[in-house]
């Protein structure tokens, strides 16, 4: 049920761009500040740390406002696992786009320090 990587990547980048454009104006600078990395699935290092192989996305690094010596050693970024998202969407392009959007917003929420309820209150989910 796989699709060519270039196709998955193009769809995901387009959907993330579209999602960022639709964010409230006060959140757009934050979206510009956190890079998005696109990978097929979690790598061996993440799996060794106990993450599930079917993980859809994750935020690494510290949320906005956390800047101390004991903070995360990783730079802030959102990871989207495109083949997992495609499989989760059962190979349906429109569903894939929607799952990319939902996963991006969910991980962006972690970057902002927001939980699911707060994202819903803001109308983002």
Residue spans for each PLM region:
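Short alpha-helical catalytic segment bearing the HExxH-like zincin motif
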Residues: 99-107
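Short hydrophobic/aromatic patches at helix-to-coil boundaries
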Residues: 121-125
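Active-site rim/adjacent substrate-binding subdomains
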Residues: 1-99, 111, 117-120
